Amino acid sequence: MRGFGELEAVIMDRVWEHAEPVTVRELHGELSAGRVIAYTTVMSTMDNLHRKGWLERVKEGKAYRYRPSASREEYSARLMREALAVGGDTEMVLSHFLDQIDGEESEALRSVLSKLRGGRPA
């Protein structure tokens, strides 16, 4: 798994922001407010994301409504898992990662580890 391309990332960010499934036309309207982009470009990118398994779609009349198949957090976790898998020495990768996080992120990590251990401190 690789990260999203530039337009894929922009589209996924917008889809994640929507509480309800969104059509290509709706998303194109949002995106074209800030940049020149063809409707067909948005449509083909969303179709590609669907074929890759990142978007689910349901037919509504002549159009599809798209929603993410995974949350933004699940996607981020998959990227982190991939980085561990291809990064070489797992302990060193984690060590370098921990050197780069701030106090708030460190506390969040401790909290998650504690919950996973049944409330015992990490």
What residues fall within each predicted segment?
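Amphipathic alpha-helical dimerization/coiled-coil segments
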Residues: R78-G119
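Short acidic, hydrophobic short linear motifs in intrinsically disordered regions
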Residues: P21-L31
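Glycine-centered, phosphate/nucleic-acid-interacting loop/turn motifs that mediate DNA/RNA or nucleotide
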Residues: G53
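Short, hydrophobic-biased segments on the C-terminal half of alpha helices
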Residues: M43-D47
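Short beta-strand "wing" residues that participate in macromolecule-binding interfaces
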Residues: R57
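Short helix-to-turn junction characteristic of helix-turn-helix DNA-binding domains
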Residues: V15-A19
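Pre-recognition alpha-helix immediately N-terminal to the DNA-recognition helix
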Residues: A9-R14, E26
